[in-house]
């Protein structure tokens, strides 16, 4: 049985190892890292890092660039920006609802002032 490809970035980010990979790539300042460099920095094997990178790539969060015989992985700006924009929108909606509830339950609102 073949696993279904991960296309949802939030599903991809649901794994702590994949989040660690994203954090390492973000900390690199855009220079990118090879599978071996990532494996050296994580408590998982090189094949496991490769599998996680494949899922992150399918979700649009990571891109790969062949350089010589190596593949260098970097964050995919468009994918990361899409996640950020979604979170900003959801946070804004939640904050607006909270402000509405808070204003309706303040002592002044309850007392009719």
Which residues does each predicted region cover?
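Beta-hairpin "wing" of winged helix-turn-helix
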Residues: 57-67, 74
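N-terminal helix-turn-helix DNA-binding core of bacterial DNA-binding proteins
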Residues: 2-45, 69-81
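Alpha-helical residues within the helix-turn-helix
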Residues: 40, 51, 57-58
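Amphipathic alpha-helical dimerization/coiled-coil segments
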Residues: 1-5, 23-27, 81-113
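Residues in the helix-turn-helix
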Residues: 17, 48, 55
